[in-house]
A protein has these predicted regions:
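Extracellular beta-strand-rich, repetitive "passenger/adhesive" scaffolds
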Residues: 1-89, 95-174
Length: 174
């Protein structure tokens, strides 16, 4: 941990029993493992109130929930490709940049909680009409891109505990 400094990795793998103590600045991920993960966490991620930025323009996946009970603090996904996630908790904010899509890796069992704000500036966030995930947000701000609300044909739902603002994007509901 280099407090307040920035760190850049091709990918981040935390093995079972291992710990990554993140900087309180920004940890940038620019590639993925041979297994297709920009982050593959089977251990403990200590966020130190820092930001993780995915800056990779090829489809990849995020496995950010390890065994330590703490997920990411801030996450920025800046990608022109699809980024998939498993069940995840973002302790503060999730920002979506780039023309790509961020979505759960399957139609069921991948719930997302963003305790702060989902800020969608470009690209798309969400899944299709058969989605059975529950996505929970403190707030949502759509400045651009497309927010695909969970629900419709599946049993999934989108929960917003605070404010929901669309100031320049598209909202799609299935």
């Amino acid at each position: 941990n280099a407090a307040g400094k920035n760190a850049t990795f091709g990918s981040l793998t935390i093995a079972s029993g291992g710990t990554y103590s993140a900087t309180s600045g920004t940890t940038t991920i620019t590639n993925e493992t041979s297994g297709g993960f920009a982050i593959n966490n089977d251990g403990t991620f200590t966020h130190n109130k820092g930001t993780v930025k995915i800056d990779y323009d090829t489809s990849t996946n995020l496995d950010i929930t390890g065994t330590g009970g703490v997920d990411l603090y801030n996450l920025i996904v800046d990608s022109d490709a699809t980024v998939g996630y498993n069940t995840s908790v973002i302790e503060n904010n999730l920002t979506k940049l780039g023309s790509g899509l961020i979505r759960p890796t399957g139609d069921s069992g991948r719930n997302l909680t963003v305790k702060g704000t989902l800020l969608l500036q470009a690209g798309s966030f969400g899944r299709g009409p058969n989605d059975t995930h529950t996505n929970t947000f403190g707030n949502i701000v759509v400045e651009g891109g497309e927010l695909i609300l969970t629900g419709g044909g599946g049993s999934g739902k989108t929960i917003v505990n605070g404010s929901f603002r669309n100031v320049g994007g598209t909202i799609t509901s299935h």
